[in-house]
C-alpha cells in the first residue's frame, strides 16, 4: 500500500523538495493533499502534476483563481481558508502530514493532525517553539509519532536509532553561522535583507534564511530539540560549523559521540522521515571528505543576541518562547521590507519579552492570546 501524504506548504522550499522525493518513489508514496498560503499558480501546477485528492489555499482571496486554474481537473477538490487546513489533515486516507508551512500558522493544523492520529513529519519548528509542551502531551495522548525533518534534528534522531534507553549526556547542535559570522557588530548594523538572504550553504525560504543570519533559527532549534528529545537546554550545545557537513551529534554518558554527516541536501531528512526506519535510494551528490576541512567554533552570544534570547526564553518556560516567536515573525518580515535594522530585530524581541504578559502554565487559548499580544507590542516599536 502506498503511503498517502498531505503536504502543508507544498509550494515552499521544503514542500517542493518533498515532492521531488515522492516523484523518486512513486511505488511508495502518493500525495493526498497539497496546500499553500498565497502561491495559487504554483499550487495549481503541482496539482496538475501530482493529482492529489484535494488542494487548499489558505488565503481565501485566491480561491476563485485557483478553482478556475483547476477547472479541467474535476478529481482535484479545491478548498480555501484556515478552517479548511484544519479539516483536511483529518481526512481518513492520510497516513502522514508533512508540516512545511512557515511560522505560527502551522500550529493549529498540526494539532488537528495529531488528534486525527496522523504521523507528523515536522518541518515547522515554530509549532514546538510556540507550544512544545502541549504538542508533546497531545502526541503522547494520541500515540502519534513526530518525526523531525529539520536537518539537525533528523541527524540527532538518526544518531539515537538503536540507542534505546541509553542516556544522552549532551546534544551537539551545529549551525553554519550564516553570512555574517565574521562581521563585527558595527558591520552588522548596516546589513540589508539582500545581504542576509545569501546563505552560504543551504537553499531555504526567505523567512528562515533571515532567521539563520540572526541565529534566531538556531535558538528555535534548541527549543525544538528540548521538546523532541527531552533534554534540558543547558545540555544542548550550539557549535558553529561553516561547512554544514556534520548535521548534528549526540554525546552519550560514556563519552562516545555519534553524528550524522552528509552534503547539505534537505531531501535526505525529508525522505528519512517518510521512510523511517528504512533507508531508500536518493539521487544527488555524495559526501567527499577530502574536499574540505571540517571546522567548529563557539557562537558569539554578544553578536548573536537572538540565540541567547532563545535560551533565556526556554529557561523561563511558559508562554515566553511563544512571545519570542511572535515578535520574531514581526521583525523578520519588517527587516525583509526595509522597515527594521538587522540589530534592531533583537532589540525589539527583547523589549517584547519584557512587556508581554508572562503565563507560567499556558493553555492553547493562552498561546493564541500571547501570540496576538506580542505581535501588537512588536509592531508598535517599528
Place the predicted regions along the sequence by residue.
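Catalytic, metal-anchored helix/loop core of enzyme active sites in primary metabolism
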Residues: 1-382
Amino acid at each position: 500500500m502506498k503511503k498517502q501524504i498531505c503536504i502543508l506548504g507544498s509550494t515552499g522550499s521544503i514542500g517542493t523538495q518533498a515532492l521531488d522525493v515522492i516523484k523518486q518513489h512513486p511505488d511508495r508514496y502518493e500525495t493526498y493533499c497539497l496546500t499553500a498560503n498565497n502561491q495559487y499558480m504554483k499550487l495549481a501546477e503541482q496539482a496538475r502534476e501530482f493529482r492529489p485528492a484535494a488542494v487548499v489555499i489558505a488565503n481565501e482571496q485566491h480561491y476563485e483563481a485557483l478553482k478556475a486554474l483547476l477547472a479541467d481537473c474535476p478529481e482535484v477538490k479545491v478548498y480555501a481558508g484556515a478552517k479548511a487546513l484544519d479539516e483536511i489533515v483529518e481526512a481518513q486516507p492520510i497516513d502522514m502530514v508533512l508540516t512545511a508551512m512557515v511560522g505560527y500558522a502551522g500550529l493549529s493544523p498540526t494539532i488537528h493532525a495529531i488528534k486525527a492520529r496522523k504521523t507528523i513529519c515536522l518541518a515547522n519548528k515554530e509549532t514546538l517553539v510556540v507550544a512544545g509542551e502541549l504538542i508533546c502531551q497531545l502526541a503522547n495522548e494520541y500515540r502519534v509519532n513526530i518525526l523531525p525533518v529539520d536537518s539537525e534534528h533528523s541527524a540527532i534522531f538518526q544518531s539515537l536509532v538503536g540507542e534505546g534507553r541509553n542516556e544522552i549526556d549532551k546534544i551537539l547542535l551545529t549551525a553554519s553561522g550564516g553570512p555574517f559570522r565574521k562581521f563585527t557588530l558595527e558591520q552588522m548594523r548596516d546589513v540589508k535583507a539582500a545581504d542576509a538572504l545569501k546563505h552560504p550553504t543551504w537553499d531555504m525560504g526567505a523567512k528562515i534564511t533571515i532567521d539563520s543570519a540572526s541565529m534566531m533559527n538556531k535558538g528555535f532549534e534548541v527549543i525544538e530539540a528540548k521538546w523532541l528529545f527531552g533534554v534540558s537546554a543547558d545540555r544542548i550545545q550550539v557549535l558553529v560549523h561553516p561547512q554544514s557537513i556534520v548535521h548534528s551529534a549526540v554525546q552519550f554518558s560514556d563519552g562516545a559521540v555519534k553524528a550524522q554527516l552528509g552534503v547539505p541536501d534537505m531531501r535526505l531528512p525529508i525522505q528519512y522521515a517518510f521512510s523511517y526506519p528504512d533507508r531508500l535510494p536518493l539521487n544527488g551528490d555524495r559526501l567527499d571528505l577530502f574536499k574540505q576541512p571540517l571546522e567548529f567554533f563557539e557562537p558569539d552570544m554578544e553578536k548573536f543576541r537572538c540565540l541567547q534570547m532563545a535560551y533565556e526564553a526556554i529557561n523561563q518556560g511558559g508562554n515566553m518562547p511563544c512571545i519570542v516567536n511572535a515578535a520574531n515573525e514581526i521583525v523578520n518580515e519588517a527587516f525583509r521590507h526595509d522597515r527594521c535594522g538587522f540589530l534592531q530585530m533583537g532589540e525589539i524581541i527583547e523589549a517584547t519579552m519584557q512587556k508581554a504578559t508572562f503565563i507560567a502554565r499556558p493553555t492553547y487559548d493562552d498561546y493564541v492570546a500571547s501570540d496576538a499580544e506580542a505581535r501588537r507590542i512588536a509592531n508598535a516599536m517599528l
